[in-house]
């Protein structure tokens, strides 16, 4: 099973990266793949309570790949790190199958509390360059996190989140229009003029009514 996962990791590179040309190139030059393999070994030692050895492996991997993955983090099959440099994955992070992350991604905590404090990333999610997913939250199946986003709340399945803080803009293939366009922003001066115009029309009506009463008297 372990070696099957390693083979799947290689195949995933070919599936995800059109620049991959040969097995020898992928095995020798893809730092994201090296980081994943190192983590799988470190995690195996961590589960056997060989914590120090697991941390040594993860630190050596960090030095050579620029990717920091705590050996306690749980990572599923066919995980792909594209470019890799600057990726951080915290201790209690849980990642499902077929997940892709890009360079500069942080799956981190929001404080120094004990217990579950890092994100859970469900199957088929994609987290783009520089995104920060923080805290004990869940990123749903097939969700996409836009580049540079900061996500602090749960992300629904099959949705796209962008911005700081992250907000859902697409869910189940349908756009959610939560962005205020500049032309749609409220204009307090214009609103006040319109209110004054309504008051003037009301006063004109009252004056006209009084004039008619005086003429009739």
Swiss-Prot record:
Q: Where in the cell is it found?
A: Cytoplasm
What protein family does this chain belong to? Belongs to the transferase hexapeptide repeat family.
Keyword NAD annotated:
no
> Which reactions fall under this protein's catalytic activity?
L-serine + acetyl-CoA = O-acetyl-L-serine + CoA
What is a GO molecular function of this protein?
A: serine O-acetyltransferase activity
- What's an example GO cellular component term for this entry? cytoplasm
NCBIfam families this protein is in? cysE, EPS_EpsC
A single Pfam family it belongs to is SATase_N
Name of the top EC class for this enzyme: transferase
The annotated modulation of its activity is: Inhibited by cysteine.
What functional role does this protein have? Catalyzes the acetylation of serine by acetyl-CoA to produce O-acetylserine (OAS).
- Could you tell me what this protein is called? Serine acetyltransferase
């Amino acid at each position: 099973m372990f070696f099957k996962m390693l083979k799947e990791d290689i195949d995933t590179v070919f599936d995800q990266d059109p620049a991959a040309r040969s097995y020898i190139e992928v095995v020798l030059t893809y730092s994201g793949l090296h980081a994943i393999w190192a983590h799988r070994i470190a995690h195996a030692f961590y589960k056997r309570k060989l914590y120090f050895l697991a941390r040594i492996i993860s630190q050596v991997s960090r030095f050579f790949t620029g990717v920091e993955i705590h050996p306690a983090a749980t990572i599923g099959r066919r995980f792909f790190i594209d470019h890799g440099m600057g990726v951080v994955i915290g201790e209690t992070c849980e990642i499902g199958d077929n997940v892709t992350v890009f360079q500069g991604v942080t799956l981190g905590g929001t404080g120094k509390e004990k217990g579950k404090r890092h994100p859970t990333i469900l199957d088929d999610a994609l987290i783009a360059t520089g995104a920060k997913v923080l805290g004990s939250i869940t990123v749903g199946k097939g969700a996409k996190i836009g580049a540079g986003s900061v996500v602090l709340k749960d992300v629904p399945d099959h949705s796209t989140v962008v911005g700081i803080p992250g907000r859902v803009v697409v869910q189940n293939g349908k756009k959610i229009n939560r962005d205020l366009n500049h032309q749609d922003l409220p204009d307090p001066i214009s609103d006040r003029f319109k209110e004054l115009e309504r008051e003037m029309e009301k006063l004109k009506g009252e004056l006209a009514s009084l004039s008619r009463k005086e003429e009739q008297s």
